[in-house]
Amino acid sequence: MRFNYSDLNPDLIMDAIDLSGLRIDSGLIELNSYENRVYQFQDEDRRRYVVKFYRPGRWSRAQILEEHAFAARLCETEIPVAAPIAFAGETLLEHQGYPFAIWQSVGGRQFEVDNLDQLEWVGRYLGRIHSVGASHSFHHRIQLDVESMLHEPRQLLAAGEWVPSGLAKSFFGVLDELIRHVCDAMTLDVARISLHGDCHPGNILWRDGPLFVDLDDCRTGPAIQDLWMMLNGERHEQQIQLDTLLAGYEEFMEFDPRELALIEPLRAMRIVHYMAWLARRWEDPAFPRHFSWFNTEHYWRQQIATLHDQLEALKAPPLSLMPQW
């Protein structure tokens, strides 16, 4: 869908916020977000809020409301998640064709992924999130699957002639081999539950403990999707991190060790989907401005090397649980 935010000017934003009954007593501070448009403001009581304008056409109303309901359900079970505010019973508002929601503005430090105490704490809450997610299925949110994460991106990249002609054979050759490996791996018969979906360290703030934000990509998939992005560094470091994460996680939710074989396939899916996401959003002026390297030959040479490296990772033995597991 062709769309940009050119009509989303300050007057329209403030008129939209007025619909909620809040009265702005500050300027608008634009926060870092490419998929949506997010602004911080202060009301006349000097309370800080964040308003998010969803990209029209990306999610249906039912899908957004299901995201909000999931956040509310997690909050009801005392899981620290940022949930939108309801105004007259409605969390999703709309103005001039722009769907939007408002949150209390929450501050916090960056989650220290290399801090094992913090990592175990995050593991406990992910176990609790997944306990809720396993008992409340999504009906409108999308599935984490190879069609949307691999096949559709492959078609988009080929049809759009994004890859320089001199590199296309090498790029699509390694991409197609990677897709075959991932498709085979993703046939693994494991439970699919309701997930945060984009649980990387940047979506966890630290206050007196973890605070999970941005459920915009919540979806149905294997539990490991919310865990693998916590792992970084060399293999032995990832092994320690995994052990620590699961020590907290399994206090609340049993983990199926077979899912460890999905870490590299899921990483591969994220890599490919990201390339297609940039291509899909290129007509939004924010993207050429912030990702000017995307349509350069150097970038695509790098991606060929990245795909080759990821193909080798797919062929390597997966991480395993420590002996006590």
Residue ranges and their predicted role:
Residues 1-86, 320-325:
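Conserved NTP-binding catalytic cores of kinases and kinase-like/nucleotidyltransferase enzymes
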Residues 35-51, 84, 180-227, 325:
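Active-site acidic catalytic loop and adjacent metal/ATP-binding pocket
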Residues 43-138:
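ATP-binding pocket architecture of kinase catalytic cores
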Residues 56, 100-113, 154-162, 274-290:
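A glycine-centered beta->alpha junction motif in the catalytic cores
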Residues 112-169, 190-192, 290-291:
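A cross-family kinase active-site recognition segment
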Residues 141, 257-267:
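All-alpha amphipathic helical-bundle segments outside canonical DNA-binding/catalytic cores
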Residues 223-254, 270-286:
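Active-site activation/catalytic loop segments of kinase-like enzymes and analogous catalytic loops
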Residues 276-325:
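ATP/Mg2+ or Mg2+-diphosphate-binding catalytic cores
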